[in-house]
Amino acid sequence: MSHLVENNILSENGLRVLSLFDGISCGRIALDRAGFKVKDYYAYEIEQNAIKISRYNYPSIYQCGDVFDEDFSKYDGIDLLIGGSPCQFWASSKCSKTAKKKREVKPDGEGWNLFMQYVRALHESKPKYFLYENNYGIGEEIQAAITKELCVEPVLLDSQLVSAQRRKRL
């Protein structure tokens, strides 16, 4: 990791991280386990039980609320933007018949609106690096639209590489 600091990619003081749809701060856990020092971690999450767990594990995390209520330009030049908008709108596996009928397969609807908040944060915060993740089972049309919005091709990973679960992630 020292070559990242030498090349001025990471600050010696630690990363400044903006996390959308933070959940229980698994992004922070992953950064810690990878050996990255984190200076500031700004979390956007609205699920109160997830926030309680995050606060218990990481009292220093700044809990910032709802992504819809924020002007992300105040994070201009942040080191890392991470996030994965809620996947229940796009997931295909293990869905009930009712859920499958409501599953979004086109880039519109509530799931798409949440994803576009990530895109807005990306444009407003202009991070040095970003990571967006979601489930493998999203529809091809949505995946193509995400690729177009982010201007990068997805990389397929199986979460069993880093956890006790077998779940394909993009």
Regions found by a protein language model. Give the residues of each.
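Conserved active-site and SAM-binding loop architecture
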Residues: M1-L170
